[in-house]
Regions:
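Intrinsically disordered, low-complexity terminal tails
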Residues: 1-123, 417-424
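Secondary-structure capping and boundary motifs in well-ordered enzyme cores
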Residues: 24, 121, 192-196, 215-218, ...
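Assembly/oligomerization interface modules of large self-assembling protein complexes
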Residues: 110-200
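Short, Φ-rich (hydrophobic/aromatic) sequence segments
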Residues: 119-142, 222, 313, 361, ...
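Short, solvent-exposed loop/turn segments at the edges of secondary structure
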Residues: 197-201, 296, 396
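Alpha-helical scaffold segments that mediate packing/assembly in large oligomeric complexes
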Residues: 202, 206-221, 225-285, 338-340, ...
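Sequence/fold signature of self-assembling virion shell proteins
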Residues: 260-268, 272-283, 299-300, 306-424
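Short gly/pro-enriched beta-turn/loop segments at secondary-structure junctions
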Residues: 289, 293-298
Length: 424
């Protein structure tokens, strides 16, 4: 009764709990006093300063990098923390980096001088920008088709010195082992192929105008173009060398060249080119074993864009019909070339920018993993370009980055490709 009197008029919940839990008078009085205390107002502090990792994730999201890539790189927890900043611009990114490292920056951007100077003096800002730039450049590079990587062997070099590749003669083939178990020695020819990597790249500056304009995507468009340029530079190197016909690479002497009025692209000329390709010898020596066939098949049919449709029709047609006069028609009886070769068509082959270009010449290439006609090498096997920060000139209020790729292209085994002139 006394407990009921103490809690009466206040909280029926307390009375019920007191009965259920067997509170004494003292406990009941204490709980009533606690319940009667006024509730303190909630205190709302300022939002916590994001970490460098959260800012980096926010910058990735703002740059439009695919969500699965972001999740793989940062994890779900970091992405959740970065979500409120997913549309962060350059101004806010610069300011937040400065605050993280203890710099006092104005809340109002104004002319940006104080914020920009503080941000550019940090360690975190260039690191975040370098990360975002490398990712956007890599995505652009990987989205760009590179014909050279289909047609060439790909190797790795550890420095910029010239490296050598040797060709195994026909005398190096397997021979029957005598009853004594003695294996005969093969021989490497004196003929060797070389290659080396060089550096290709450009400089990119982030200056105060980019920060004031507050357009991260516009800045990253330049980075994306650097990625595309990296891909284009590989094809440019390859086609410049390839079309120049270095050292008479494609020639009758190498048994990999056809010309004449009957070599215009078509069924019969493709048959002739395939036959020439299939009859390549182990050579180049004069011994009987050097004249053994190597039995390598062409895999790629390489044509200029002017011939691309005809090549695709020939590869895709189940039948070929010839009229009474022997003239080929557009109507596709059995096609021996159907789906035999993978068509690779590039505008470089007929563009007058490249010496040796032709709108009529076409080629057959072996699988480069079997018999490479050309080789591409990358320094330490890194195929994609890379972006690094560099020191900006002292008279420049900005931040410098360099994008570059270390790559080399060189002709290798002439037996790995055939050129057909396509005309007399």
């Amino acid at each position: 009764a006394r407990i009921r009197a103490i809690s009466a008029g206040q909280q029926s919940e307390l009375e019920a709990r007191a009965g259920e839990e067997g509170w004494d008078v003292t406990r009941t009085e204490l709980e009533v006093l606690r319940a009667a205390r006024p509730t303190a107002p909630a205190v709302h502090g300022s939002s916590p300063v994001p970490t460098v990792r959260v800012l980096e994730a926010a910058a990735w999201m703002s740059a439009g990098i695919d969500e699965p890539d972001c999740l793989s790189e940062f994890g779900e927890r970091t992405l959740e923390a970065a979500h409120p900043l997913r549309q962060i611009g350059l101004r806010e990114l610069v300011a937040e980096c400065a605050r993280i490292e203890g710099h006092s920056v104005p809340r109002v951007f104004g002319d940006g001088q104080a914020t920009i100077r503080a941000g550019f003096s940090t360690i975190s800002l260039p690191g975040i920008l370098e990360s975002v730039m490398n990712r956007t450049m890599l995505a652009a590079y990987q989205a760009s088709p590179i014909a050279a990587l289909q047609l060439c062997a790909v190797g790795s070099v550890s420095d910029f010195k010239e490296v050598s590749r040797y060709r195994l003669l026909g005398t190096g083939g397997f021979e029957k082992v005598s009853p004594t178990g003695e294996l005969k020695s093969g021989a490497l020819s004196e003929q060797k192929y070389s290659n080396r990597a060089d550096t290709y790249g450009q400089i990119l500056m982030l200056d105060r105008r980019d920060i004031i304009n507050d357009d991260l995507d516009a800045f990253l468009d330049i980075t994306r173009q650097m990625g595309r340029s990296g891909a284009e530079s590989i094809d440019d190197l390859f086609f410049t060398l390839f079309l120049s016909n270095p050292g008479s690479f494609f020639s009758a002497g190498n048994s990999n060249y056809l010309e004449g009025a009957d070599t215009a692209f078509g069924t019969d000329s493709l048959t002739s080119a395939k036959t020439l390709f299939r009859k390549q010898k182990a050579g180049p020596g004069t011994k009987a074993k050097d004249q053994k066939p190597i039995n390598v098949r062409p895999r790629f049919l390489v044509v200029p864009v002017e011939v691309e449709t005809d090549a695709e029709l020939l590869m895709g047609s189940a039948q070929l019909m010839i009229d009474a006069s022997g003239t080929k028609t557009k109507i596709p009886v059995d096609n021996p070339h159907r789906n035999k070769y993978e068509v690779v068509s590039m505008p470089h082959l007929s563009d007058s920018y490249y010496a040796g270009s032709s709108a009529k010449a076409w080629y057959l290439f072996a699988d480069p993993a079997v018999l490479p006609a050309f080789e591409i090498v990358f320094l330490n096997g890194r195929r994609a370009p890379v972006i690094e920060r560099i020191e900006a000139p002292p008279n420049t209020l900005g931040m410098g980055f360099r994008g570059y790729i270390d790559v080399g292209v060189k002709e290798q085994d002439p037996r790995g490709a055939v050129r057909v002139k396509g005309e007399a």
